[in-house]
């Protein structure tokens, strides 16, 4: 088992072995995010699902109300005059067969790939390149669409695609350590509601098993997910 660095061990010693209320957990992680850069805040949710079964898979999007604090580089595979329209809407890269060819050769200078339905037969051939990176466009994720301008705007504003990994854990960045605790809580609450709203039909037993929040270089803190779910339900 790898040893914790002295710095991380020192930070972890400030955290008690218990679950924390959502706002308290966020404040604690923020307090420990003291690297020389603006650390990314991450949520790690263990769900009671087995994604090897199709009715227990989770893949969707969340529109974080306060954004992620990160610049998203978007590439669009489309055709005709829509190529210029995609660039005008804010896409860093846009093209048709030429972009498909570039991607097939390993040119991946983007964080998100959007495609129009007419180009999906060509994009589908890139599965070996895009699949392992989680970049294959998908209608459920809003990355296969005819409304390119709206999709580009939404993803630039903080819309995120996420999925449960093969062990049933969801990993999502939900802001920066420089955000206020209230802004981060609002983002985390939106994520929780999205996960609950998209509960797979085949999920059995307890859906939420654990929730941890952490920063890029900091220790993780366990959050009382029931308290998070109860926010806004008072009265």
From Swiss-Prot:
A single GO molecular function term of this UniProt record: structural constituent of ribosome
Keyword presence, Lipoprotein: no
GO BP of this protein: regulation of translation; translation
Cystine pairings recorded for this chain: none
Keyword Glycoprotein attributed: no
UniProt keyword terms in alphabetical order: Repressor, Ribonucleoprotein, Ribosomal protein, RNA-binding, rRNA-binding, Translation regulation, tRNA-binding
Lineage: superkingdom: Bacteria
Subunit and partners: Part of the 50S ribosomal subunit.
Family: Belongs to the universal ribosomal protein uL1 family.
Function description: Binds directly to 23S rRNA. The L1 stalk is quite mobile in the ribosome, and is involved in E site tRNA release.
Protein name in UniProt: Large ribosomal subunit protein uL1
Source organism of this protein record: Synechococcus sp. (strain CC9902)
Name of the gene this protein is made from: rplA
């Amino acid at each position: 088992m790898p040893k914790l660095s002295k710095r991380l061990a020192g930070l972890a010693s400030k955290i008690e072995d218990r679950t924390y209320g959502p706002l308290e957990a966020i404040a604690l992680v923020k307090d420990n995010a003291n690297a020389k850069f603006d650390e990314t805040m991450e949520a790690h949710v263990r769900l009671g699902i087995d994604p090897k079964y199709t009715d227990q898979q989770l893949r969707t999007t969340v529109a974080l109300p306060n954004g992620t604090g990160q610049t998203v580089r978007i590439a669009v595979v489309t055709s005709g005059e829509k190529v210029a329209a995609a660039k005008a809407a804010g896409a860093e890269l846009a093209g048709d067969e030429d972009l498909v060819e570039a991607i097939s050769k390993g040119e991946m200078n983007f964080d998100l790939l959007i495609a129009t339905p007419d180009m999906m037969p060509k994009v589908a051939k890139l599965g070996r390149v895009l699949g392992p990176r989680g970049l294959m466009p998908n209608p459920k994720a809003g990355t296969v669409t005819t409304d390119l301008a709206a999709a580009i705007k939404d993803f630039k504003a903080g819309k995120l695609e996420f999925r449960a990994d093969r062990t049933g854990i969801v990993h999502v960045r939900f802001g920066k350590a420089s955000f206020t605790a209230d802004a981060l809580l609002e983002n985390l609450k939106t994520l929780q509601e999205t996960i609950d709203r998209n509960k797979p039909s085949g999920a059995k037993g307890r859906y939420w098993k654990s929730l941890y929040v952490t920063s890029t270089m900091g220790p993780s803190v366990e959050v009382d997910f029931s308290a998070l779910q109860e926010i806004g339900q008072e009265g």
